Amino acid sequence: MIYLDNAATTLRKPPCVVDAVVAAMGSLGNAGRGASAGSLDAARVVEGCRERVAALLGCARADHVAFAPNSTEALNCAINGLVRPGDRVVTTVLEHNSVLRPLNRLAAERGVTVECAGCDALGRLDMAGLERLVTPGIRAVVVTHASNVTGNVVDVACVAELAHAAGALCVVDAS
C-alpha cells in the first residue's frame, strides 16, 4: 500500500516516536505553566526544539519560530494574520482544505482576490501558469510542498523566489 496522507494521520509511528511520546507523558509537565521540575524540563525541551527548528530553517532568531498544535491551525494563523482586506493571493489547485477554506472565507468576507495556478494531467504544478499569476502587487503565494493527493513535490525554493521577486510573502504547507 502507498500511503500519502501522513500529515493527517501517520499510518504507523516509528518506534522512536512512540518511545519519545511515552517518555514525555511519564516525565514532563506543561511548558510555561509553572516552576515545577516537570514544567521547567518541558520548557527546556520546547526551547531546544525551537532552536533546532530555527537552525534547520536558517532563522537567525529562535524566538521567531512559533509552534502550533497542528498544521491546520498554523496555516490558518499564518493566512489570517498576513492577508489583509482587498489583498490578492495566489495559490494552487493542489492545496488542502487547511489552505483553501481560510482563503475562500477571506475572499467572501474581506474582498481578498484568490487566484489558483493549475496542474498538468499528472498532478504536477504548472510552474509557467504560477509564474504568470505571481506579479507585483500580490500579498502572498500559498503553496503546498507535497500533495497528499498526487504525491507530487513542488519546488518551493523556486516558488519562494518567484514570490519574493514580486515583493510577496511565501507561505508553505510543509506538513
Regions found by a protein language model. Give the residues of each.
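Pyridoxal 5′-phosphate
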Residues: 1-175
